[in-house]
Amino acid sequence: MKSELPEPPEHPKSIVFLGTPEAAVPSLRKLVEAGFEIPLVVTMPDRRRSRRAAPTATAIKQAASELGLQVSENAAEALEVGADCGVVVAFGQLISEEILSKLPMINVHFSLLPKWRGAAPVERAILAGDETTGVCIMRLDVDLDTG
């Protein structure tokens, strides 16, 4: 049985942002432009694009650095900064129930759920020949794209 998760506040002031790819960068920039305090940005670790290449920072890590924001690769650190809630955009990993039980989160998913749950929803919609798609914004749940 799932535990009851906290509701995001109606008017948050401080937001932890969790995201990884280029597709998440506009959301981060808009939150900053709108005046939200972003005490922490959480992203996936730097990755090599090939065996011989040096590790490359994620697009979100690069954008956060340009914006002067603190970056971490550890989602648990989101609990340490006193934010009102978290916003998740294409983060790339599930958020633990321990974190969700203490910090309400909102997820932005690039499909009309429940269709194309999981990774690469835009690409999968194109490959399937979908003529209509969209974006879902939902309270994050412990399961994948089910909030």
Task: List PLM regions with ranges.
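Short beta->alpha connector loops
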Residues: 20-23, 76-77, 91-94
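Short acidic-hydrophobic, aromatic-tinged amphipathic segments that line or gate anion-handling sites
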Residues: 70-74
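Donor/substrate-binding cores of folate-linked one-carbon enzymes
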Residues: 14, 34, 85-147
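Short amphipathic alpha-helix with an adjacent loop that forms part of the alpha/beta core around
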Residues: 75-84
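N-terminal beta-loop-helix "entrance" segment that forms/cooperates
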Residues: 45-65
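A generic structural signal for well-ordered alpha-helical segments
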Residues: 31, 62-64, 99
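N-terminal Rossmann-like dinucleotide-binding module
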Residues: 2-51
